[in-house]
């Protein structure tokens, strides 16, 4: 394998190992393959990947229900960490040799990955590259849907469904670090305990308790100001039941289905807002603005220890299928990562 060298003398091979989706299907369709190392375009960096985070959208892409946006790599993986080894034209904020963690448009399950320079962030102080790889996708998602679209304001209370998921553990810690009351739902006593250890004021076991009634009780009848919901389906009318007047429901996934029956009179009378978003199709400029907001508002909180990494298990790149099996089982608490080694 011939290696090319950039101007700063970091050798980059022509070929790399990647995980391909051989056909739409279950975890078994993920296969190790060889591909050409991508070249950074203007405004992009090439990262030698140390680790890649594993997320639900990766599983959806593998199953054939969440196609990459036009121009994005068909290799799964939306967040990585590693070392910058090549720069596209116009990149000035990073230099070759810098360590970064980054949101990617795809291609993270690989030894090398390109991404816009503005989507990179420095690994937090004291965090390993594997730990840093699990930050971008969930932190971008929470920032957009809780703090921007959900408009979580000082004094507001947040309810997070799926509190023990990667999104959940990020939302708990981000909101608590900024001084908010946080309630969550989770499906076992172990998961509820883990959420409370991370800062949730109360974790509600949705298998044994009515979360809507419990949230109303915990807030003296007021309800939550913002709800982050990745379940959808029949959770939505229950969400509205425990939203405060002028409350905001932010939908980010539909693990419980895409259809719900609502009492729209309740929406009007109590001035409720229902919003939602997906991250991957958003523009480079939008994601860069989110990265800048995270670096300004959240990174200082991480650096002083108010937010900590929560990794349940790591796998090698060759065992990506096992990582997908685990995340789809719902047994994990926190994040799952692939250690690539770059």
List the predicted regions and their residue ranges.
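Glycine-rich beta-strand-centered segment in the early N-terminal region that forms part
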Residues: 36-54, 65-107
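C-terminal capping/lid region of NAD(P)-dependent oxidoreductase domains
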Residues: 5-16, 299, 304-313, 321-342
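Glycine-rich phosphate-binding loop and adjacent beta-alpha segment
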Residues: 178, 234-307, 332, 339-342
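Short, glycine/polar-rich helix-capping loops at beta-to-alpha or helix-loop-helix junctions
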Residues: 108-111, 186-194, 211, 259-264
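A structural motif shared across PLP-dependent enzymes of the aminotransferase-like
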Residues: 104-117
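Short amphipathic alpha-helix with an adjacent loop that forms part of the alpha/beta core around
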Residues: 211-221
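Short helix-loop-beta connector
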Residues: 95, 125-128, 151-157, 221-222
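Mid-domain Rossmann-like dinucleotide-binding core that forms the NAD(H)/NADP(H) cofactor-binding site
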Residues: 133-209
């Amino acid at each position: 394998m011939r290696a090319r060298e950039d101007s700063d003398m970091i050798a980059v091979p022509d070929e790399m190992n990647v995980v391909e989706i051989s056909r739409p299907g279950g975890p078994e369709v993920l296969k190790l393959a060889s591909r050409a190392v991508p070249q950074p375009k203007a405004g992009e960096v090439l990262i030698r990947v140390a680790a890649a985070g594993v997320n639900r959208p990766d599983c959806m892409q593998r199953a054939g229900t969440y196609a990459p946006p036009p121009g994005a790599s068909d290799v799964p993986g939306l967040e990585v960490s590693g070392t910058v080894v090549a720069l596209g034209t116009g990149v000035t904020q990073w230099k070759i040799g810098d360590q970064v963690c980054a949101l990617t448009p795809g291609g993270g399950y690989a030894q090398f990955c390109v991404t816009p320079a503005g989507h990179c962030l420095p690994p937090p102080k004291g965090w390993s590259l594997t730990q840093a790889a699990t930050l971008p996708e969930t932190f971008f998602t929470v920032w957009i849907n809780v703090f921007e679209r959900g408009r979580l304001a000082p004094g507001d209370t947040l309810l997070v469904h799926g509190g023990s998921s990667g999104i959940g553990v990020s939302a708990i810690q981000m909101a608590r670090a900024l001084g908010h009351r946080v309630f969550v739902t989770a499906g076992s006593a172990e998961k509820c305990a883990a959420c409370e250890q991370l800062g949730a004021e109360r974790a509600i076991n949705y298998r044994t308790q009515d979360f809507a009634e419990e949230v109303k009780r915990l807030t003296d009848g007021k309800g939550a100001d913002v709800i982050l919901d990745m379940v959808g389906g029949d959770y939505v009318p229950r969400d509205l039941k425990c939203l405060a007047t002028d409350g905001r429901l932010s939908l980010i996934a539909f693990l419980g289905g895409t259809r719900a029956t609502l009492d729209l009179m309740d929406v009007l009378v109590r001035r409720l807002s229902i919003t939602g978003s997906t991250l991957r199709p958003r523009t480079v400029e939008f994601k860069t603005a989110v990265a800048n907001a995270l670096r300004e508002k959240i990174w200082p909180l991480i650096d002083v220890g108010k937010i900590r990494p929560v990794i349940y298990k790591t796998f090698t790149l060759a065992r990506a299928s096992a990582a997908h099996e685990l995340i789809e089982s719902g047994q994990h608490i926190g994040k799952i990562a692939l250690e690539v080694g770059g």
